[in-house]
Design a protein with these regions (language model features):
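Extended, low-polarity segments enriched in aliphatic/aromatic residues
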Residues: 29-134, 145-434
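Proline-enriched interdomain boundary motifs that mark the N-terminal boundary
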Residues: 434-442
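Short coil/turn motif common to extracellular beta-sandwich-like domains
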Residues: 441-450, 551-553
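Short beta-strand segments within Ig-like beta-sandwich modules, predominantly Fibronectin type-III
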Residues: 463-469
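Solvent-exposed segments in extracellular or luminal domains encompassing
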Residues: 471-483
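Edge beta-strands of extracellular beta-sandwich domains
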Residues: 492-503
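Extracytoplasmic
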Residues: 504-607
């Protein structure tokens, strides 16, 4: 059998951005926007409750579906990670995801609901009311702002799993036609570790791979990197925007860049992870700035209107399992009913981006203060054809990107369509039964399967009945094996979950001492390789080579410890075959920390 030479390279570099620049508004140069040390103010809506603006979108116009199950997110806030499988019920996440998708349509089953979403989307795109066709590409933009693998809130792995389950297992979308990505961030570890064993052929991407000169901005922004779009998004037939419920900035009267740029991060700012250079957009989204305010340009509106971003979005989802109080914050509990000092443990979905952003803003504002002018971008988007700013947005011919309004109060959460007083938003609560049969958790470690079920008459593992509702089953397998756990009522399966335990053969180990080192990479006495130099200034790389078969499948397991994750690339016979196979990161910040922490595992098929 012939051999190829595989090379893996790791690169470390730093970049400094200067944030105070002259910017142009409506074709005129305005004074330099310098926000350091200034007051972000506090948000007070200028529009009264239940006074909708814009034109509602969706099969049910203006509908935002909301599902809440307090037993879905059960992390105690202290032990382990919020993303751990025993802290989130896959069954309950599946039910919430299914509930909000069905609620957006006129259907009563999840397969028919997705089919209607695809057909409606294609009809509006001028393709006719056709269903999904095998081979069409779907991208899922998730939020990995903090690189995954810590208790700073990112996309919940169980949420990504649930979406892939619906697309792959129910709608029969080929795994290799799906890409899950955040092109602006350095890690996908927690999501990848949980999801990849079951869906190994899905494309999991983070940093890299941009198509130049795709995005044009209506004002201010001319940077070439900001005009580039992630290749995955550019080539997709369908975009699924899977955001978080996140307050981006904690208001302060002495702003610094670390405080954050804008009020909230939901489906709008989530797309900053799709563009090649983000800092040039920051000035334009500081609606709280004394240089801006209500009725001013906001670049998020351009992304919402863009044909390859907002215009290519099949559905908007908000993973609200845990609310992040700041762009790099840890989960915060909500006090008001139905949360009752608990996690939000929710999902939202809509076909109207302005509406779902408005609802996310209202939820956050009901519990946390926001910086001034938090909904300026929604006023602009709802009225893009004739916005308060007077900006001639590139997407102005759309007239409106959706409907915006504020609910009547944080207790009743009623919008104009709920009240029957207008054609604004409808917040639809998906009915759920907390006492339904469920798999509360099911996962594997190196030695055993761990499971817990509730309200089941019978529990089966790979078709064999288990005597206990919860337990630990020792593992003794010599090859990769799939395990399927089922809960039954009246002999009928009501919930199931699959776990795949991988066993690798022909394992080869590449020692750090065998690496080729360049620049700031040094070999330590203990045999590890370290990048030395001041933070943000050291530049270097390490690489190693291994012979592999011309065809087949292989996995790479790379252990790396450091506070600054670094990118890595694959080369075969000298040719780079990946934009970036992933940033490597662990929980430790110093050499020797992070034992047993996160490892990067990548798979590459050679043909």
């Amino acid at each position: 059998m012939g051999l190829s030479v595989l090379a893996v390279g790791i690169l470390l570099s730093g970049t400094l951005y200067i944030m105070s620049v002259d910017n142009s508004l409506m074709g005129q140069v305005i004074r330099k926007q310098i926000d350091n040390g200034t007051d972000m103010g506090r948000f007070v809506p200028i529009d009264a409750p239940n006074t909708p603006m814009g034109v509602a979108r969706g099969i049910h116009p203006g509908r935002v579906a909301w599902a809440h199950d307090p037993k879905a997110a059960v992390w105690d806030g202290k032990r382990g990670l919020y993303s751990d499988p025993d802290n989130n019920s896959q069954t309950r996440v599946d039910d919430m995801m299914e509930g909000v998708i069905i609620a957006l349509t006129r259907q009563n089953t999840i397969d028919k609901a997705w089919d209607e979403l695809f057909r409606t989307f294609n009809y509006k795109k001028g393709k006719g009311a056709v269903k999904y066709k095998k081979g069409e590409k779907i991208v899922v933009k998730i939020n990995l702002n903090d690189n995954g693998g810590t208790n700073i809130i990112d996309a919940t792995p169980q949420s990504v799993y649930s979406l892939l389950h619906q697309l792959v297992d129910i709608m029969k979308v080929p795994q290799n036609c799906i890409t899950v990505y955040d092109a602006q961030r350095r890690g996908i570890s927690a999501v990848y570790d949980y999801v990849h064993p079951v869906y190994p052929n899905v494309n999991y991407q983070n940093w890299g791979g941009f198509v130049p000169d795709v995005i044009r901005y209506s004002s201010e922004i001319t940077d070439a990197g900001a005009r580039s779009l992630a290749r995955a998004a550019y080539e997709a037939d369908y975009m699924i925007n899977m955001a978080l419920m996140k307050r981006h900035s904690e208001p302060t009267d002495k702003w610094r860049d670390s405080a954050g740029q804008t009020a909230i991060t939901a489906t709008g700012k989530n797309q900053f992870g799709s563009i090649g250079n983000v800092p040039p957009l920051h000035l334009s989204i500081r609606d709280w700035s004394s240089f801006r305010g209500m009725g001013t340009y906001n670049s998020i509106v351009d992304l919402m209107a863009h044909e390859r971003i907002g215009g290519n979005t099949l559905v908007y989802l908000v993973d609200a399992m845990y609310v992040n109080p700041k762009h790099n914050g840890k989960a915060v509990r909500f006090q008001l009913p139905p949360f009752n000092n608990g996690w939000t443990s929710s999902f939202l979905a809509s076909n109207d981006q302005v509406a779902i952003e408005s609802v996310v803003l209202d939820f956050i504002y009901s519990e946390l203060p926001l910086c001034a002018n938090a909904d300026n971008f929604l006023h602009e988007a709802a009225n893009i054809g004739n916005p308060p700013s007077g900006i001639a947005y590139i997407g102005k011919e759309q007239g409106s990107l959706g409907v915006h309004e504020h609910w009547n109060n944080p207790t009743h959460r009623m919008y104009s369509r709920n009240l029957g007083t207008g054609k604004g938003i409808e917040l639809y609560r998906v009915p759920l039964n907390e006492k339904r049969p469920a798999i509360e958790y099911f996962y594997a470690d190196e030695n055993a399967l761990h499971y817990k079920t509730s309200h089941a008459e019978e529990v089966r593992l790979n078709g064999k009945r288990l005597e206990d509702a919860e337990g630990i089953i020792p593992l003794s397998i010599s090859k990769t094996t799939a395990f399927n756990l089922e809960v039954l009522v009246n002999k009928k399966v009501t919930s199931s979950q699959r776990v795949v335990v991988r066993r690798l053969e022909d394992i080869g180990i590449c020692q750090a001492k065998d690496m080729e080192r360049q620049g700031s990479a040094f070999l330590n006495e203990d045999g590890s390789v370290e990048f030395k130099g001041e933070k943000g200034s050291s530049e270097g790389s390490v690489s190693w080579k291994v012979n592999i078969p011309h065809k087949g499948e292989y996995y790479l397991v790379v252990s790396y410890t450091g506070g600054n994750p670094v990118p890595s690339y694959l080369y075969i016979n000298g040719e780079k075959i990946s934009e970036n196979i992933g940033y490597l990161a662990t929980l430790g910040e110093k050499r020797g920390e992070g034992k047993g922490g996160k490892k990067w595992i990548g798979k590459q098929c050679i043909s």
